[in-house]
């Protein structure tokens, strides 16, 4: 898939995953997740849109941090929730 230039990439920072063991909210709630996404602005680890609670998308909206990277082993892609596109 092609990537697009995205002005939100200016928000990307060097981050350390806050909860490398899983979705921050799901761990607290003891909820299941499917895949994980890493916020590239603050290091929040949230669950994907295929997960029941979609915490990565919720974080992007509430914190205003739209750029995430897959936090799955072997995957190397980034997504912008504002533009709904790979970046």
Question: Where are the predicted features?
Answer:
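Canonical RING-type zinc finger of E3 ubiquitin-protein ligases
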Residues: 31-40
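Cys/His-rich, Zn2+-coordinating zinc-finger modules
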Residues: 3-22, 29, 46-87
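A detector for small-residue-rich transmembrane helices and their helix-helix packing motifs
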Residues: 2-3, 37
């Amino acid at each position: 898939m092609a990537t697009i230039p995205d002005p939100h990439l200016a928000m990307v920072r060097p981050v350390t995953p806050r909860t490398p063991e899983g979705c921050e909210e799901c761990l607290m709630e003891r909820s299941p997740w499917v895949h994980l996404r890493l916020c590239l602005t603050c290091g929040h680890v949230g669950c994907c849109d295929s997960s029941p609670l979609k915490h990565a998308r919720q974080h992007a909206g509430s914190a205003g941090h739209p750029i995430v990277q897959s936090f799955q082993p072997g995957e190397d892609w980034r997504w912008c929730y504002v533009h709904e596109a790979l970046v």
